[in-house]
């Protein structure tokens, strides 16, 4: 089965986890940014999981260097463009890129400039390739609540211009959703769609709270609903799509192998599974690689692929017209 040739959809891809390593080097040299190595083969060890990783927190350390080169409008635009260029080459037809604007203010850019630069890169790629992209704004859970309000308020002017949703991301603590009720209430009033990272690092109850307290329409990862019957039942009853990222889940030690990952059990039980990369560079992966691994180790069939693709179409934060276009690729 040639997954490379099949059309694909990416709903969970972090911009700062998906930079080309040669771009990091190029920008660092241009902007005089210190790196631990200026050799591409050595630098990759600092931005990708090459051998082993013991936790989500250790995984998140790989973002430090990429964010250093994402502090100017020019660089943000370039990096967004290159991401869409790369996924278009993998036959991805639609992508929702997510990033946290407040990680890119070190050199004085404001939130509006940051969002605008990323949107410019996305739109430039759309002109050249057979791909459409939208943007999800992330609020970092290790920042204070006023920071989250700031992202929601300042990003709202871009809703309908490429920004489609809000997300909470970063390290996951038990019962975090309770802190963000007012933030997400405001986001919903502005018209943001809502996806929340939850149930990635062992706490299935967070998925329950993300849906009940924050009105999450999709869940980033969500794999630990397997340990919370109430969350599992709610996800199934409400048809809440899960943005599953298998290789990333292995890297963060959520599971030991593809074979023990619960995605196939979820799929067979009609949970709305979508398959995504999470971070193409950090996890050294593509959507094609994800599908190939699931085919090799879990018996993913062409019928399963089509189910996942159509789940992704329905879950996408895009227009009815765009969804019709995406469905035609597999009809």
UniProtKB/Swiss-Prot annotation:
Signal peptide extent: none
Residues annotated as the enzyme's active site: 200
Positions that bind substrate: 14, 16, 170
Catalytic activity as recorded in UniProt: adenosine + H2O + H(+) = inosine + NH4(+); 2'-deoxyadenosine + H2O + H(+) = 2'-deoxyinosine + NH4(+)
Enzyme Commission (EC) number: 3.5.4.4
Name of a matching Pfam family: A_deaminase
CDD domains: ADA
GO biological process: adenosine catabolic process; hypoxanthine salvage; inosine biosynthetic process; nucleotide metabolic process; purine ribonucleoside monophosphate biosynthetic process
Site (Important for catalytic activity): 221
InterPro entries: A_deaminase, A_deaminase_dom, Ado/ade_deaminase, Metal_Hydrolase
Cofactors demanded by this protein: Zn(2+)
Amino acids binding Zn(2+): 12, 14, 197, 278
Official protein name in the record: Adenosine deaminase
Function: Catalyzes the hydrolytic deamination of adenosine and 2-deoxyadenosine.
Cofactor binding note: Binds 1 zinc ion per subunit.
Family: Belongs to the metallo-dependent hydrolases superfamily. Adenosine and AMP deaminases family. Adenosine deaminase subfamily.
Enzyme class: hydrolase
Keyword annotations: Hydrolase, Metal-binding, Nucleotide metabolism, Zinc
GO CC term (a single one): cytosol
Gene Ontology molecular-function annotations: 2'-deoxyadenosine deaminase activity; adenosine deaminase activity; zinc ion binding
């Amino acid at each position: 089965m040639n997954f490379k040739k099949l059309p694909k959809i990416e709903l969970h891809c972090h911009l700062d986890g998906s930079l080309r390593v040669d771009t990091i080097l190029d920008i660092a040299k241009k902007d005089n940014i210190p790196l631990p190595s200026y050799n591409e083969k050595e630098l990759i060890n600092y931005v990708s999981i090459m051998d082993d990783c013991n936790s989500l927190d250790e995984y998140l350390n790989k973002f430090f260097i990429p964010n250093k080169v994402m502090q100017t409008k020019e660089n943000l635009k370039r990096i967004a463009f290159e991401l869409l260029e790369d996924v278009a080459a993998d036959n991805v037809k639609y992508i929702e890129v997510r990033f946290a604007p407040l990680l890119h203010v070190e050199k004085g850019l404001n939130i509006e400039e940051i969002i605008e630069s990323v949107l410019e890169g996305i739109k430039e790629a759309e002109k050249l390739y057979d791909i459409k992209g939208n943007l999800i704004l992330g609020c970092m859970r290790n920042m204070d609540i006023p920071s989250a309000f700031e992202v929601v308020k300042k990003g709202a002017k871009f809703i309908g211009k490429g920004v489609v949703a809000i997300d909470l991301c970063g390290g996951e603590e038990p019962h975090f959703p309770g802190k963000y009720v007012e933030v997400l209430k405001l986001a919903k009033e502005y018209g943001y769609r809502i996806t929340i990272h939850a149930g990635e690092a062992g706490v299935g109850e967070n998925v329950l709270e993300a849906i009940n307290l924050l009105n999450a329409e999709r869940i980033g990862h969500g794999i630990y609903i397997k340990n919370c019957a109430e969350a599992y039942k709610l996800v199934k009853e409400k048809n809440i799509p899960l943005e599953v990222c298998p290789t990333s889940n292995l890297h963060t030690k959520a599971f030991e192998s593809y074979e023990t990952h619960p995605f196939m059990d979820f799929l067979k039980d009609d949970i709305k599974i979508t398959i995504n990369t999470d971070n193409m560079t950090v996890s050294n992966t593509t959507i094609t690689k994800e599908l190939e691994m699931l085919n090799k180790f879990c018996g993913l069939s062409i019928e399963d692929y089509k189910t996942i693709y159509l789940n992704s179409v329905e879950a996408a934060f895009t227009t009815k017209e765009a969804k019709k276009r995406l469905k035609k690729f597999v009809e």
